[in-house]
Amino acid sequence: MRPGSNVIKAFNVIGMLCALVFGAPAMAIGIDDLSSKDAASGLKEALTKGAEVAVGQLGKPNGFLGDARVKIPLPESAQSVEKMMRTFGMKKQADELIETMNRAAEMAVVEAKPILTNAVKSMSFDDARGILAGGDDAATQYFKRTTSEAIGAKFLPIVKKSTAKVDLAGKYNKYAGKAAQFGLMDKKDADLDSYVTQKAMDGLFLMIAEQEKAIRKDPIGTGSNLLKKVFGAIGK
């Protein structure tokens, strides 16, 4: 196989899907056994797998804590306090709080899977067309738009249950709330549970975006049977 041929084929797959979804005649692209419905279904398969991979990566032990891209630190406005804690012999407590935050995110993120899957199932033909024709993060933006509220509602109680086990988390909320009243801390960072919930969502969508980029770069790598069907057809 010539160098770069897989990359060329990958772009051809995306081009073919766009042609199918936009209604180009099948014979015009050399395939007469695929329909626009097949193309949209193939996209849904790929996005479902991508979402599952993202959730799986983050939901495993150290999915957040062990990955610098998504690890949740203390809020920026509280990091000076963290530095003081570490300086004055409270390193263990600071580490415990940060670990608790990230473990909470790891437990919560698995709840996103059915919500993301349902968003894919509910995707309209126009949504699919927009994703195929959109930018590198068009699918990620679709997920954000359609799932953020539901995911946040699922994450928050799980995060609260986890942080409630750590005394320092309660103290953080107490003193950070007062600091926010006096303008010494950003209000969005004053509630640790809400902060962790948002950061967990940010991490999830970051990983989904990376999966989307991988799908666009190498559709065949998703394992979608319909995309394999297209790939095989253009590879003959």
Model-derived features with residue positions:
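N-terminal signal peptide c-region/cleavage motif recognized by signal peptidases
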Residues: G23-P25
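Mid-length scaffold segments of soluble, non-membrane domains
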Residues: K91-S162
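A cross-kingdom marker for long, charged
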Residues: G203-K236
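N-terminal Sec/ER secretory leader and immediately downstream segment
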Residues: I29-T100
